[in-house]
Amino acid sequence: LLLLSACNQNETKGNLHITGNIKGLKKGTLYIQRVVDTTLVAIDTIHIDGISTFESNLDLKSPEMLYLFLDRGVSNSLDNNLSFFAEPGTITIETSLDRYLSDAKITGSKNQEIFEEYKKINTRFTDENLTLIEKRFNAIKNKDTKAADSLSAKQDSNTKRKYLFATNFALNNRDFEVAPYIA
C-alpha cells in the first residue's frame, strides 16, 4: 500500500503580495479593484476590525492599475479610492485614515515610482493653470480685456505644454507598462 499524506501548508496564491497599514482605521472594509470594461470591479475584499494592517494575495496576468477603495461606512467620495500601479512582487501601502490619499506611500513597484514622478511634475502644470484662472478671473472682474486675453493665451500654452510633457514622459518610459496610463 502506498500512503500519501498532505501537509497543511500556508501557501500564498498569486504573484502579487500586498501589505499595508491605514493608521487610525479601526473598522471598515477595503476593496481592491480593477477596471473591467470601464467599470471598477472588486477583486478582493478585506474587513478591518480593530487592527489597521491588511494583506492580500492576487494573481496578475500583467502589471496594471489597481484601486484600493476604503469603505468607511459614512461616505462614498473620490478621496476614498487610492490608485496604485501593481506588478508581480510585494507592494506595501502605508497611509492614514484622516489623509487617505495625501499620506499614501506606495513601495515595491517600479511602475508606481514612475507614475508618482509623472504626477509630481504634472501637479506643477495644474497649479500654474489654477493661478492663471485666478488672474484671468480678476482681470475679467476689473474689465481688463487685454489682460484677460493675454492670460487666456497663457492658459492655452500651459495646456499644450502639459500634453507635450505627458507624451514625452510616456515615450521616455515606453519600456514600462505605466506609459499608456500617462499618454
For every predicted segment, state its role.
Residues 1-7:
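Sec-dependent bacterial lipoprotein signal peptides
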Residues 7-153:
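A non-transmembrane, solvent-exposed segment enriched in polar/low-complexity residues
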Residues 150, 165, 181-182:
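A general alpha-helix detector
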Residues 156-174:
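Amphipathic alpha-helical coiled-coil segments
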Residues 174, 179-183:
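Alpha-helical protein-protein interaction scaffolds
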